[in-house]
């Protein structure tokens, strides 16, 4: 391995800002402001440029000369920040936002890009070929890269993407920028938001052209940083121009904040007015170093780098006194390319295979106390895997496979690994198949299933309070499920029919966002495939959610999922089960209310009428039209969403409950069934189909 030695000049800029900040306490004097610039980084027009422009195509008449710059630049906050409490192995959550732009040099291709960086070693660099100026893999670091150079050898998906790196230049996950609505090479100023929640073990990244944070993140990755960070880490930015590429990587407005381990979620900061400060703190202290070292509850803000020239004069004087030439050597070689790294490169982090020992360790040997759910073919355990974090382990029971007429493990595994990446779908994290044991590992969602919230019985303990989902939360849940189904039906490469949409399979995250799971019954079709050409299957699913035509023909379709979605909508609005303990059918009950002009009588009494009546009626009507007995009258889920949001007219419902019409595929006659009640369970799966 060849070793290369480089020297860097480190400029310690201490900027004494004598500005008045009305938003801060009058008892508080702004501490000494301090950034450290490395390599090519420099102040430029009230911003920081991490790199310098350099010639890409030197004249053939000009003799080659020694490069004037390393092509690498960094800007780090001078004080290390506490990220880990060693006694409890608790990691701080954090959030930051900053504006940036990447401007290519004339007649030059773009450089490597830049990264938001958290590193244990401020002086560690990988010099060979740039690599965004990231640290040596031997050091602990986390980086969110904004990459503009395509390097397929190291897992890049293209030359315009955002990725998350953890102590490696191989991204654990990445996403194409163009597909998410922004272009890193546009030269325009953009905003980025990065958040890590230690409770959720989740990193999320948002990017947009507006200062308003987008609704959905462009990248979301489940990862536990407790084993990835040191007690104190340095925070800032890093960039590089490698080879013939050259660009200015400019960072302007930057805010950074950490949160204690007790914080359940990242709290949105209000826009502050102290635009002129370089580094300022929201806490009162006479000792500036104390602000940045005292633990989890400190706050560091790096805001607008719009610094008047006169305010730099004291800092320039300090630079003349403090500048020192620090020569150091770094031993670095080629990137370590292991088989594991190769297997994890690509567009997204592919779920990895886990050993049975890891699964047993995660679940304490499949401890009964860790069980959080149980179905016909599998038991779900809560667990923890160091490389992933909190997980839900779905352990399959082979004894029940013959009853399912298929291998549910294989069905769900192939569906999840091949297609599904959506914010409203439970994310697949790994799998195990060893001996007679098979298991799938998913993200753990702390609030459990939607069914538990809708139908939880009062506790005998008077001190235990039942959480009632608000109307706003319920509408958001319905829209989340609709988004997931739209993705499955219309946006995936191949159409996926879930076949088991029900509240038990809708999970809720810490913020009560819906995530659809359990793809053990899913069917996959080409979008161009005709319904008539699909083979009939033995109807499978859950009584109360199955479309009538599916029960009688055995052919699943997008509209059979729509029917199930309609029942879910009614269940969420009313708080009633699809089939009550007394045999009452929810769909029938809602038609009875509709026929008497009292559809709002179906609203959940637990809401105590704390809802918008017009919106409630609109959503109930959507549920009824989606659960229409005639599949041709059901809307697409996407169209149902437009009605719920008031963007489309209300559906037209008949004055009386329509008759159920079944058209057998090979028979001329049609079957007409009037709406019955009680034991016959109209529009439901016949009892003979299920035990």
From Swiss-Prot:
Predominant place of localization: membrane
Alphabetical keyword list: ATP-binding, Cell membrane, Glycoprotein, Kinase, Lectin, Membrane, Nucleotide-binding, Plant defense, Receptor, Serine/threonine-protein kinase, Signal, Transferase, Transmembrane, Transmembrane helix
Keyword Phosphoprotein among record annotations: no
Membrane topology of this protein: Single-pass type I membrane protein
Ranges facing Extracellular side: 26-311
Signal peptide limits: 1-25
GO MF annotations in UniProt: ATP binding; carbohydrate binding; protein serine kinase activity; protein serine/threonine kinase activity
UniProt record similarity statement: In the C-terminal section; belongs to the protein kinase superfamily. Ser/Thr protein kinase family. In the N-terminal section; belongs to the leguminous lectin family.
Name used for this protein in its record: L-type lectin-domain containing receptor kinase S.6
Biological classification of the source: Eukaryota, Viridiplantae, Streptophyta, Embryophyta, Tracheophyta
């Amino acid at each position: 391995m060849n070793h290369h030695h480089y020297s860097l000049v480190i400029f310690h800029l201490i900027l004494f800002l004598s500005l008045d900040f009305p938003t801060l306490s009058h008892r508080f004097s702004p501490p000494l402001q301090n950034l450290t610039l490395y390599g090519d980084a420099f102040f430029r027009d009230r911003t920081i440029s991490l790199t310098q422009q350099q010639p890409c195509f030197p004249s053939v008449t000009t003799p080659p000369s020694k490069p004037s710059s390393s092509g690498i630049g960094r800007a780090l906050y001078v004080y290390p920040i506490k990220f880990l409490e060693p006694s409890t192995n608790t990691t701080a959550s954090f959030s930051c936002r900053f504006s940036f732009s990447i401007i290519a040099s004339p007649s030059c291709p773009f450089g490597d890009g830049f990264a938001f960086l958290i590193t244990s070693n401020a002086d560690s660099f990988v010099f060979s070929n740039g690599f965004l100026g990231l640290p040596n893999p031997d050091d602990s670091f986390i980086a969110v890269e904004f990459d503009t150079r395509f390097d397929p050898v190291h897992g890049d998906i293209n030359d315009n993407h955002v990725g998350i790196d953890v102590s490696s230049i191989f991204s654990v996950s990445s996403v194409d920028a163009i597909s998410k609505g922004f272009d890193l090479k546009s030269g325009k100023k953009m905003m980025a938001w990065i958040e890590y929640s230690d409770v959720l073990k989740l990193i999320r990244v948002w990017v947009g052209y507006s200062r308003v944070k987008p609704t959905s993140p462009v990248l979301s990755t489940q990862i536990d940083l407790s084993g990835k960070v040191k007690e104190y880490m340095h925070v800032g930015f890093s960039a590089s121009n490698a080879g013939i590429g050259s660009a200015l990587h400019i960072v302007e407005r930057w805010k950074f904040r950490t949160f204690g381990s007790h914080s359940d979620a990242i709290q949105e900061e209000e826009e502050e007015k102290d635009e002129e400060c370089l580094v300022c703190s929201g806490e009162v202290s006479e000792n500036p170093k104390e602000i940045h070292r005292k633990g989890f509850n400190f706050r560091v803000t790096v805001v607008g780098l719009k610094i008047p020239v006169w305010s730099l004069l004291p800092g320039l004087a300090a630079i003349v006194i403090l500048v020192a030439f620090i020569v150091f050597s770094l031993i670095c070689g080629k990137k370590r390319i292991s088989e594991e790294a190769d297997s994890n490169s690509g567009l997204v982090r592919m779920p990895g295979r886990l050993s049975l020992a890891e699964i047993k360790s995660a679940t304490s040997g499949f401890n009964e106390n860790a069980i959080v759910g149980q179905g016909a073919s599998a038991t779900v355990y809560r667990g923890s895997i160091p490389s992933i974090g909190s997980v839900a382990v779905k352990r399959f029971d082979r004894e029940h496979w013959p009853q399912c007429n298929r291998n549910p493990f294989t069905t769900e595994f192939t569906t999840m690994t091949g297609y599904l990446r959506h914010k409203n779908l439970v994310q697949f994290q790994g799998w195990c198949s060893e001996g007679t044991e098979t298991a799938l590992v998913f993200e753990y969602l702390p609030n459990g299933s939607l069914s538990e919230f809708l139908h939880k019985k009062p506790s005998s303990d008077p001190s235990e309070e039942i959480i009632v989902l608000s109307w706003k939360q319920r509408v958001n849940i319905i829209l989340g499920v609709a988004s997931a189904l739209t993705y499955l039906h219309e946006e995936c490469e191949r159409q996926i029919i879930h076949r088991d949409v029900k509240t038990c399979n809708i999970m809720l995250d810490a913020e009560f966002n819906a995530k659809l799971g359990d793809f053990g019954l899913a069917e996959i079709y080409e979008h161009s495939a005709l319904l008539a050409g699909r083979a009939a299957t033995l109807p499978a699913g859950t009584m109360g959610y199955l479309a009538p035509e599916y029960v009688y023909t055995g052919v699943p379709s997008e509209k059979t999922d729509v029917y199930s979605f309609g029942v879910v909508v009614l269940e969420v609005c009313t708080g009633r089960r699809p089939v009550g303990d007394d045999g009452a059918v929810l769909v029938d009950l809602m038609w009875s209310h509709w026929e008497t002009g009292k559809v709002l009588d179906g609203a959940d009494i637990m809401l105590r009428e704390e809802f918008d009546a017009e919106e409630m009626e609109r959503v109930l009507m959507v549920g009824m039209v989606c659960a229409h007995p005639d599949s041709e009258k059901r809307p697409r889920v996407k169209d149902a969403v437009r009605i719920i949001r008031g963007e489309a007219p209300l559906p037209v419902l008949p004055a009386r409950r329509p008759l159920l019409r079944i058209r057998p595929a090979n028979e001329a006659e049609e079957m007409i069934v009037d709406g019955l009640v009680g034991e016959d369970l109209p529009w439901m799966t016949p009892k003979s189909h299920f035990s």
